[in-house]
Amino acid sequence: MASRDSSAASEITPDVLLRAYACGIFPMAESVDDPSLFWVEPDMRGIIPLGGFRVSSRLARTVRSDAFTVTVNRDFKAVIDGCAAPQPGRDDTWINRRIRELYIGLHDIGHCHSVEVWQDGDLAGGLYGVSLGRAFFGESMFHRARDASKVALVHLVARLLAGGYTLLDTQFVTDHLKSFGAIEVPRLRYRSLLDDSLEGEASFAALPLDRPVTGTEALAIITRT
């Protein structure tokens, strides 16, 4: 289920990408230096049930302290570049030049969003993902300071809950995501959840976009579910 020639990759547009997400598939690259893309549709799909999102007591204290400043869509390109950069335990990345271009294109038309986490004016971590209907597809996250990507995820989930989203797709499940409540569901079950989430519209702007949301505000939304 893959097409790895670079000419096929160049024909993928943001609109084609949105249609692919609506069908339950997403693109990846073998490495940052590989110009081609291939489509992925896992047999078992990772999701975080929004009503079952878990925040540890230690992380909640960090979020509540506002040691980080959290913004949305302030520097999308810096976030995707941070996700593409090597990190401890991960020397390579699947975010190649074409992937970067496509998701910047989705961001430009309002279907891809970033959450930035700042510390003393520097970008300490963040994440980005695709918004379609009432579904949010988490693409990648990174951190340069302890807990920065975790704080980004907490703020993302608060925003999704406030905006009426019903599906948070993580694509795959890692031990890290399991600690937040991530589970795997079979492809048919995932497609049912996806179809339901595409029947309505959610708002990524239900929480303010023009000012940072405090950790206390974010946690209050999560604990109400």
From Swiss-Prot:
Q: What is its EC number?
A: 2.3.2.6
- Per the record, the major location class is cytoplasm
Q: Which UniProt keywords apply?
A: Acyltransferase, Cytoplasm, Transferase
**UniProt GO cellular component terms:** cytoplasm
The record's SUPFAM superfamilies line, in alphabetical order, gives: Acyl-CoA N-acyltransferases (Nat)
Name a biological process GO annotation.
protein catabolic process
Compartments, record wording = Cytoplasm
Similarity remark = Belongs to the L/F-transferase family.
* Purpose: Functions in the N-end rule pathway of protein degradation where it conjugates Leu, Phe and, less efficiently, Met from aminoacyl-tRNAs to the N-termini of proteins containing an N-terminal arginine or lysine.
UniProt xrefs under PANTHER family: LEUCYL/PHENYLALANYL-TRNA--PROTEIN TRANSFERASE, LEUCYL_PHENYLALANYL-TRNA--PROTEIN TRANSFERASE
Q: What is this protein called?
A: Leucyl/phenylalanyl-tRNA--protein transferase
Q: Which organism is it from?
A: Rhodopseudomonas palustris (strain TIE-1)
Name of the coding gene: aat
